[in-house]
UniProtKB/Swiss-Prot annotation:
Sugar attachment sites: N261
Organism phylogeny: Eukaryota, Metazoa, Chordata, Craniata, Vertebrata
Subcellular location per the Swiss-Prot or TrEMBL entry: Endoplasmic reticulum lumen
Domain J: start-end pairs: 25-90
Molecular-function annotations in GO: misfolded protein binding; signaling receptor binding; unfolded protein binding
Gene3D superfamilies (UniProt xref): DnaJ domain, Urease metallochaperone UreE, N-terminal domain
One cellular component term from this protein's GO annotations in UniProt: cytoplasm
General function of this protein: As a co-chaperone for HSPA5 it is required for proper folding, trafficking or degradation of proteins. Binds directly to both unfolded proteins that are substrates for ERAD and nascent unfolded peptide chains, but dissociates from the HSPA5-unfolded protein complex before folding is completed. May help recruiting HSPA5 and other chaperones to the substrate. Stimulates HSPA5 ATPase activity. It is necessary for maturation and correct trafficking of PKD1.
Modified residues (Phosphothreonine): T188
Signal peptide (UniProt feature, chain positions): 1-22
Protein name: DnaJ homolog subfamily B member 11
Length: 358
């Protein structure tokens, strides 16, 4: 073999060996940098899981493989120990570890029966009985509304499991009509089957991951399909987390805008001042006033409000209302005369209907 061909062959061999050892690029699969936080990894998985789910891509022969790669990437990068091993040794360093079902990972975010693509509730077959839905209020802070968050909820869920023997049931949904009198009828379900497998309800602990999206509004609901009350003859209902934004001690939310009040001294109101307001994510909003600030004056800081739920790139305003703290102690006659001389302002005593703007 010529030296040049031998060199090319060796380089190709080294490349193939490196590829085998390295395995799949989990960061590339999730579309995140190697410095990505756990929050970024969860957001990326949640977004891609909806796009790549095989049920949503029935015509793609590689859909199942892509979905499995996505689940494997999330399982490793969301676990600090596995991620450390992967960063050091590649996928080969994880071969001896336990791997979760990718369906389990998906249900961790969306529920047992997956996410209803298109955002519409699942269509219920009227012939299949269904357990009750459960609605749970989930309290979130204004800080979480601003920046988003992932909240883990541990739920003890009764699950129908097979039990020995048979049971009587109404799986065929047959009805009996009984006439009670003229124009009065009663319909009852008829138990016509005694051959169905027996079932029992067993409590199982499940950990669900609720994504608090930036800009989420009070009263919005996050559904987890099949995580509601079970039904021994059918399918379980749904679990819905209803967002309840708790009050904040500094900011008040109105739509995408934030409101707050700032109290300044009389001296600051007259001569000006500078100050910083600590925002919900810790960054500072600088305020500088070099003119007179009257009680009730408002200052708009555009882009310093909450992110819009539908488009996080758009943010509302921060509206600051100023209050003036007047001195508590009484002024001396000399001080009063000094103020009169300084301000050179005569009496202004006007009586009017302020509510009408006159």
């Amino acid at each position: 073999m010529a030296p040049q061909n031998l060199s090319t062959f060796c380089l190709l061999l080294l490349y193939l060996i490196g590829t085998v050892i390295a395995g799949r690029d989990f960061y590339k699969i999730l579309g995140v940098p190697r410095s990505a936080s756990i929050k970024d990894i969860k957001k990326a998985y949640r977004k891609l899981a909806l796009q790549l789910h095989p049920d949503r891509n029935p015509d793609d022969p590689q859909a199942q493989e892509k979905f499995q790669d996505l689940g494997a990437a999330y399982e490793v990068l969301s676990d600090s120990e596995k991620r450390k091993q992967y960063d050091t040794y590649g996928e080969e360093g994880l071969k001896d570890g336990h791997q979760s079902s990718h369906g389990d990972i998906f249900s961790h975010f969306f529920g047992d029966f997956g996410f209803m693509f298109g955002g519409t509730p699942r269509q219920q077959d009227r012939n299949i009985p269904r357990g009750s839905d459960i609605i749970v209020d989930l309290e979130v802070t204004l800080e979480e509304v601003y920046a988003g968050n992932f909240v883990e909820v541990v739920r003890n869920k009764p699950v129908a499991r097979q039990a020995p023997g048979k049971r009587k049931c109404n799986c065929r949904q047959e009805m009996r009509t009984t006439q009670l009198g003229p124009g009065r009828f009663q319909m009852t379900q008829e138990v016509v089957c005694d051959e169905c497998p027996n079932v029992k309800l067993v409590n199982e602990e499940r950990t669900l991951e609720v994504e608090i999206e930036p800009g989420v509004r009070d009263g919005m609901e996050y559904p987890f399909i099949g995580e509601g009350e079970p039904h021994v003859d059918g399918e379980p209902g749904d679990l819905r987390f209803r967002i309840k934004v708790v009050k904040h001690r500094i900011f008040e939310r109105r739509g995408d805008d934030l409101y707050t009040n700032v109290t300044v001294s009389l001296v600051e109101a007259l001569v000006g001042f500078e100050m910083d307001i600590t925002h919900l994510d810790g960054h500072k909003v600088h305020i500088s006033r070099d003119k007179i600030t009257r009680p009730g004056a408002k200052l708009w800081k555009k882009g310093e409000g909450l992110p819009n739920f539908d488009n996080n790139n758009i943010k509302g305003s921060l509206i600051i209302t100023f209050d003036v703290d007047f001195p508590k102690e009484q002024l001396t006659e000399e001080a009063k005369e000094g103020i009169k001389q300084l301000l050179k302002q005569g009496p202004v005593q006007k009586v009017y209907n302020g509510l009408q703007g006159y």
